[in-house]
């Protein structure tokens, strides 16, 4: 059956339909309005004053049922001239439906009668028809009503949850969380809205649901990460609380109350697991929050979930972590101690504390391969810590008892091993095999003590005899006198004569061992002296052999004479080098040992100190340059400085000061430089010159060796030693008695000839380099050269000694020497020009004070530089070309 519900028809059409007796199909009918419920709803809404205002279309548009109804209404109104007939429109539609239904029932009645149904049956079937129609309409109504209630309830719950979440994250207005203003105002409660009248138009349930779905993405996207971090902190804190099992002093009362209201650890772990499983699924996450909204949104544990709450939670966790770490480290330390003691005792830990507790104790410190972000915590409560302490104390007591027992047994073993002279290999093997504190090791050590005691009973007499022999040997080594030995001998004889039992023999043996120990301590101090005495005796033997060999003249005629001489030279060097050191060290050691030993040391029946003095005198007599004198002199100087506290002032000669003997008259001394390090003084007698030969000579780069008898010297005033000074200052006269104190520093000759050239050349220039025509440089003749060679090889054997004889000839020869064209390398003479254009001669002087005494007056003869220079000068003189033959 089709019914027209679109709009009222014209009266003419309606009449035609009634007369025709058939159902008329209205071309403007809309299928969405083809139900009685819809029509009823439209009729009920016709009385609403807001109906026309809420219609979102204009009156003359024909796109929707409401548009058609409004258009037809105005059409009928203008045609009939009636007032507002909205109710009449819906009533006419229902009249048409009822008429169609009536006609349908009439036709159905005709069919029933033709079939032959009775009136009762026909009435029953009509009731069924009306009941079915009524139930169908009622079913649609109930479905719509249920949908309405469901949407209203879901929207209300989700809206309430979202608003509670915004309060938990400290954003009740949603400004920080929801960026869309329309969505934010659609889901917020009226008291949380920033714009109370928004939205102006009420939303349908489906529109509100769509707005809530959009808002859930923003709210849950901000809330779930915070909730996940907060749950992790809560779970960590719960683990720590369960491990420590007590409130710590660093927490406030509010913290303790909040901790007491936390859900159980299993509940928090389940919450975190559901959040991880629903990650990325808004539906599952929303369902999780709805199911657990009593704890998450209503409970005090989740009252505020933001960065500040997480930060505060981490501070509480830090307090518990510090306490846990302290206790955990203590447990680990005690665990290591327990394991070490059990290993030393050789006893399994399970037999002492039980298997369960042993497994729990072993679990501490063992890393577990877990993928969870939350660390694993071990129980460190007071009860567990006390149990571990009791276990450790028990093991320490057992360890101490066994260690003391082993120490006593090992002391007995050590004494017996020493007395019985057991080999070290056996002792090391035994101690290595019994290093633990197990009952088996203690039993083996006890058996070893018993075995050694049995051996001692059999060998104690021999041990006493060996100890007595060793004591006598040490007495001889330490040179003990009979008086020093007599005290112990008396005690020893008394104990030995009265010893009849094993205990008395042990007392005698112990007395001998104590004496041995005392003598060995003295021997330790005496060993360095023994070593020096041995060296002293060896050097004496070498000296005696050297004397005997030197007296045998036939050794020079033997075939291996060179080997004999080489051996003698090695012995001589060994004596001169090592004998002084041995003598000095031995004397020092003897002085140190005077307070430790009662009697003096003897050497070949004489006191060792006397033998040392005699030997030192012999060495000084035979080897004057030996180190004995030098070391003793040095030692004497050091002692004088320490005792008298006198500091000797030494004057060092520099380039601007020259050391000159006191009383020297420079006017009477004509000094001419012949070599860089040698000088002769003109105007001195031959005897005086012989004394001058003993003066110490200086070379550049060599040390200064002074005479043993030093005399006082002073520095000459600068006005006197100035090169250009020509004043009338009286120069000191030369004192012959003090000529030996002349310094070897070069002097500048202040008396110059008319045509003298300075500085004077030490060797003549060859004739082929000199222009003989008009040259003022004289030539060296054969006669003068021979005189020079004769003087250089005089009786003194010194090259630099000059005789006053034939003084004029020497002056003529000196005038014939020319200026050098180039100074040799390493020369002490440096020629420079002053700003006034005058030549200046600078003499470089290096005086080095020697800390050793001079032991030879011919030291310079062995100087390498001096010999080289001497050979050069002689070769140059031999290379002269003589013109006068």
Swiss-Prot record:
One of its GO terms (biological process) is mitotic spindle midzone assembly. Residues 734-745 have a biased composition (Low complexity). The keyword Membrane does not apply. Keywords: Cytoplasm, Cytoskeleton, Microtubule, Phosphoprotein. One of its GO terms (cellular component) is cytoplasm. The keyword Phosphoprotein applies. The modification Phosphoserine is found at residue 17. Its main location: cytoplasm. Belongs to the MAP65/ASE1 family. Present with 556 molecules/cell in log phase SD medium. This is Anaphase spindle elongation protein.
């Amino acid at each position: 059956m089709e019914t027209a519900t679109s709009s009222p028809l014209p009266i003419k059409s309606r009449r035609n339909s009634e007369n025709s007796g058939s159902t008329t199909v209205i071309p403007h009918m809309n299928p969405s309005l083809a139900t009685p419920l819809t029509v009823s709803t439209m009729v009920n809404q016709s009385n609403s004053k807001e109906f026309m205002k809420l219609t979102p279309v204009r009156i003359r548009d024909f796109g929707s049922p409401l548009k058609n109804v409004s258009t037809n209404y105005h059409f009928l109104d203008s045609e009939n001239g009636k007032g507002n007939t909205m109710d009449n429109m819906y009533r006419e539609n229902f009249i048409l439906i009822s008429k169609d239904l009536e006609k349908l029932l009439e036709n159905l009645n005709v069919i029933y009668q033709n079939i032959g149904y009775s009136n009762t049956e026909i009435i029953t079937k009509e009731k069924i028809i009306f009941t079915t129609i009524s139930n169908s309409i009622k079913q649609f109504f109930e479905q719509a009503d249920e949908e309405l209630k469901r949407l209203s309830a879901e929207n209300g719950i989700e809206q309430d949850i979202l608003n509670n979440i915004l309060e938990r994250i400290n954003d009740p207005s949603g400004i920080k969380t929801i960026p869309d203003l329309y969505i934010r105002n659609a889901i917020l409660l009226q008291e949380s809205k920033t714009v109370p009248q928004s939205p102006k138009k009420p939303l349908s349930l489906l529109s509100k649901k769509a707005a809530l779905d959009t808002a859930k993405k923003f709210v849950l996207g901000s809330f779930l990460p915070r909730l996940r971090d907060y749950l992790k902190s809560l779970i960590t804190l719960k683990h720590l609380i369960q491990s420590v099992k007590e409130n710590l002093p660093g927490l406030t009362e509010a913290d303790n109350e909040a901790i007491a209201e936390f859900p159980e650890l299993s509940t928090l772990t389940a919450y975190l697991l559901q959040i991880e499983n629903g990650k990325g699924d808004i539906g599952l996450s929303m369902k999780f929050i709805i199911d657990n909204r009593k704890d998450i949104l209503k409970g005090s544990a989740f009252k505020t979930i933001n960065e500040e709450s997480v930060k505060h939670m981490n501070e509480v966790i830090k307090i518990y972590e510090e306490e846990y770490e302290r206790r955990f480290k203590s447990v680990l330390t005690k665990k290591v101690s327990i394991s070490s003691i059990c290993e030393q005792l050789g006893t399994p830990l399970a037999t002492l504390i039980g298997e369960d507790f042993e497994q729990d104790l072993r679990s501490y410190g063992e890393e577990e391969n877990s993928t969870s972000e939350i660390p694993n915590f071990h129980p460190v409560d007071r009860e567990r810590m006390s149990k571990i302490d009791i276990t450790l104390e028990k093991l320490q007591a057992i360890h101490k008892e066994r260690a003391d027992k082993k120490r006593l047994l090992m002391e007995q073993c050590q004494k017996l091993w020493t007395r019985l002279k057991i080999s070290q290999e056996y002792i090391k093997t035994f101690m290595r095999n019994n290093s633990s504190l197990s009952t088996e090791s203690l039993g083996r050590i006890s058996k070893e003590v018993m075995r050694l005691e049995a051996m001692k009973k059999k060998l104690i007499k021999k041990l006493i005899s060996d100890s007595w022999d060793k004591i006598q040997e040490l007495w001889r080594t330490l040179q003990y006198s009979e008086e020093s030995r007599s005290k112990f001998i008396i005690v020893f004889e008394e104990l030995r004569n009265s010893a009849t039992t094993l205990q008395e023999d042990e007392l005698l043996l112990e007395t001998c061992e104590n004496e041995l120990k005392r003598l060995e301590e003295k021997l330790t101090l005496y060993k360095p002296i023994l070593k020096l005495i041995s060296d002293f005796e060896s050097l004496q033997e070498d000296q005696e052999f050297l004397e005997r060999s030197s007296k045998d003249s036939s050794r020079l005629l033997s075939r291996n004479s060179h080997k004999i001489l080489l051996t003698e030279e090695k012995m001589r060097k060994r004596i001169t080098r090592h004998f002084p050191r041995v003598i000095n060290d031995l004397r020092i050691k003897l002085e140190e040992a005077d307070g430790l030993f009662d009697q003096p040391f003897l050497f070949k029946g004489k006191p060792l100190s006397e033998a040392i003095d005699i030997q030192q005198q012999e060495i000084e007599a035979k080897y004057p340059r030996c180190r004995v004198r030098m070391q003793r002199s040095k030692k004497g100087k050091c002692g004088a400085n320490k005792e008298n506290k006198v500091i000797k002032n030494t004057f060092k000669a520099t380039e601007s000061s020259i050391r000159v003997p006191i009383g020297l008259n420079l006017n009477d001394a004509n000094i001419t430089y012949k070599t860089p390090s040698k000088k002769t003084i003109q105007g001195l007698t031959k005897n005086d010159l012989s004394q001058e030969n003993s003066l110490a000579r200086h070379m550049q780069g060599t040390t200064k060796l002074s005479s043993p008898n030093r005399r006082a010297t002073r520095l000459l005033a600068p006005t006197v030693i100035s090169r250009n000074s020509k004043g009338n200052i009286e120069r000191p006269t030369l004192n012959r008695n003090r000529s030996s104190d002349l310094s070897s520093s070069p002097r500048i000759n202040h008396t110059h000839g008319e045509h003298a050239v300075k500085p004077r050349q030490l060797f003549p220039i060859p004739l082929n380099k000199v222009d003989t025509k008009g040259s003022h440089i004289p030539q060296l003749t054969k006669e003068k050269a021979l005189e020079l060679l004769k003087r250089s090889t005089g009786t003194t054997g010194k090259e630099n000694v000059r005789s006053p004889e034939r003084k004029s000839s020497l002056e003529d020869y000196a005038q014939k020497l020319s200026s050098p064209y180039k100074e040799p390398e390493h020369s002490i003479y440096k020629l420079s020009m002053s700003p006034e254009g005058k030549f200046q001669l600078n003499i470089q002087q290096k005086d080095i004070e020697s800390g050793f005494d001079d032991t030879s007056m011919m030291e310079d003869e062995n100087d390498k530089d001096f010999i080289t220079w001497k050979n050069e000068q002689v070769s140059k003189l031999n290379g002269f070309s003589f013109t006068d033959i």
